[in-house]
Amino acid sequence: MNIAQKIIQAHKLKFGSLPPLQQCSVSGSALFNADCMDSLPLIPDESVDMILTDPPYNIGYADWDKFFNIYEITKEWHRILKPNGSVFCFAGWSFVCNVINQFDKNLKLNDWIIYDRIKGRGGRKRMVSTREDLLWYVKSNEWVFNKDKAYSTIKKKTKGMGEKNGRDTRALSNVWTDISPIVPWSKERNEHPTQKPLQIGERILDVFSNTGSIVLDCYAGSGTFLEAAKNRGNTFIGIEKEVKYYDLAVARVFG
C-alpha cells in the first residue's frame, strides 16, 4: 500500500467518507481537496522525504494565524518527516520572525534563503519589496544535499585559470537572483495570487532531494510544487482547502 492509499484509508476510517481527490495510481501521488489540519494526522510517521509549501501569508495577520496554526503544524511535520528529511517553507517578511519562533520548537533551522524576484511590490510609503523568504528546516544532521546540482546561472562567463575560465554557472548561494518571477505575461501564470515560479520548486527538489522521494505540499495552491515533483520523478501528496485553487491544481498536474 503506497502513501496515498494509506492516507485515503485512514481518512475513510476517521471521517467515514473520502474528500474530493485526484490520484495517480502509477506513481502513488494524490491531491486532496481538504483542510491540512484534518489530513496531516493521517499521514504515517516518518514517511515523507520533503515538505515543500507556501502557506497563505498574504491574508492578514489575524486570519493567517488562525488559518496556519504554526505550532501544531510543525509538530505534525516533525512526526511525518523522515530522519534525513527537509522542510522548505515560504514566509512573508511580516510573519517570518513569528514563523521561526514557532518552527524552532520542533525543527532545526538550517538556512534562510532569499529569493530576489527583481520585480517589486509597494513603494508608496516604504521601500519596494523584491524579496521572498524561504526557510530551510531539517529534522537531523543527515539531510540530503546534492552538491553537483547546487549551482546558479550567471549572465557573464567567468574568467580565470583552468575550469573556472568560461563558466556560466557558480556555486549556489542562499540569495537567489537568477529565477524569473511570475509576471502578468508569464506563460505559466494562472489565477493564484502568490504563485511561485516552477523553476524554484525544481531547483529545491534537484538540490535537496533524490529522485523517487515523497514530497508533501499541504498548501498546494495551484499545484506549482506538485508539478515540479512530477517533473522530477517524485511521488507527491498535495492538500488544498480552497476549491478554486484545487481545481487549478488538478487541471495543471493531472490534466
Stretch-by-stretch model annotation:
Residues D247-G255:
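PRPP-dependent phosphoribosyltransferase catalytic core
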Residues M1-H11, P20-L248:
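Core catalytic lobe of class I
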